[in-house]
Amino acid sequence: MASTVAGPEIERLIQLLARLPGLGPRSARRAALHLIKKREALMAPLASALQVAIERIQVCHTCGNIDTQNPCTICSDPRRDPAIIVVVADVSDLWALERAHATQGRYHVLGATLSPLDGIGPQDLTIDALVTRAQVPEVTEIILALNATVDGQTTAHYVTDMLQDANVKVTRLAHGVPVGGELDYLDEGTLSAAMRQRTLF
């Protein structure tokens, strides 16, 4: 049986940190030690920020983004193009597109992708809400910004079928050679998609 080297409060902190993505037990222990050593400069502000997050962060009832206001900052921004809705699986995908300044459209977060093996079906996603939004006359294009995985593509096909009766253009992100990518290191599927979706130079 492994012996504990710290009191129960510190062990609890380590256990909670180890639940975070990318942090195993060893990384969690290092993070806990760092927080404890920087108690005033780091731990107290972090605890305060977490308390604010618990009290104020909510899910946007329009798009599914998380924010401290509802509708969220993006949905409330009049500079956003109301004609375009970018569909993503998760809030992290929305944030990635925002960091890249990839679109001035609005978003719709599905909450996941269809995955029969994980028991995730259409009823677990916000597809019905997307269909309702797509029927608003000012919406003209739905961009499917879903991962190029089996689950992502299955979801894209399902969403496209559900949007058949809406008077919108449905597009998806191009797949292919990444910026700075070398052909020799790319998988066959990526190369095949890049060749099929080639554009004029």
From Swiss-Prot:
It holds the Pfam family RecR_HhH. Residues 83-178 form the Toprim domain. A zinc finger (C4-type) spans 60-75. GO terms for molecular function: DNA binding; zinc ion binding. Keywords: DNA damage, DNA recombination, DNA repair, Metal-binding, Zinc, Zinc-finger. GO terms for biological process: DNA recombination; DNA repair. May play a role in DNA repair. It seems to be involved in an RecBC-independent recombinational process of DNA repair. It may act with RecF and RecO. NCBIfam families: recR. Belongs to the RecR family. This is Recombination protein RecR. It comes from Afipia carboxidovorans (strain ATCC 49405 / DSM 1227 / KCTC 32145 / OM5) (Oligotropha carboxidovorans). The lineage of its organism: Bacteria, Pseudomonadati, Pseudomonadota, Alphaproteobacteria, Hyphomicrobiales.
